[in-house]
Amino acid sequence: MKQSILLFLLIGSATLYAQSPKFHDAMSQAITELEKDTTVEQLMAVSNRFERIALAEKDQWLPYYYAAYARSIAGFITTDKSKVDEVLDGAQKFADIADSLSPGNSEVVLLKGMVLAGRISVDPMSRGQQFGMQSGMLMNQAMQLNPENPRAYLMIGQGLFYTPEQFGGGKDKGCAMLEQSRMKFETFEPESDIHPNWGENLLGQMMAPCGSGSSVPHQE
């Protein structure tokens, strides 16, 4: 009996080990594709690719995270506002699964806040207060969960940047938070080469007007 159990464990370990490089390679290739994608169609396609990886590795939060992330970006750049909610519904679904697999994860909580922020664009006048507050709470929670996460400061700073001063935002507050993000990026090291490591390019674009008197960069 002991020998059978030991053999089972050895076979299980060998199978897990054999799957790991395959999973890593699939993720790495999909992330490389994601970094190049710029259209809604491309982002939806790579989201589907991450979903296929997730279905093969159901206990891994990262493919669900990236499937949601790709759709959240697609939602932000979708010009047909009647389709935004449908795109973000998929992002929300995948983000919720990632959250269940990795509870209390700063990256996942931040992503859930981003999905809510994306819904505001459908009708800012009617949705701004509700989704803006919910999104802000999640982003602040993400920062509290991991104070060294530069993406949390980046997304909070972006939100402040585009929020009028009379509503608690403004360029000065946004730039101050973006500066904190810049400092966090200087020391940030992802857990691996397939863990979240995006944001520096966006930060550079957002910080361009800070302290220069330039106009606020265009937000898609």
Please state what every model-predicted region is.
Residues 1-23:
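Bacterial Sec-dependent N-terminal signal peptides
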Residues 20-33, 56-78, 103-122, 148-163, ...:
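Amphipathic alpha-helical repeat scaffolds of TPR domains
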Residues 85-138:
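Hydrophobic, well-structured mid-protein blocks that either form specific transmembrane helices
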Residues 36-49, 83-93, 128-136, 175-182:
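Helix-turn-helix repeat elements of alpha-solenoid scaffolds
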Residues 53, 98, 141-142, 181:
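Canonical positions in the second alpha-helix
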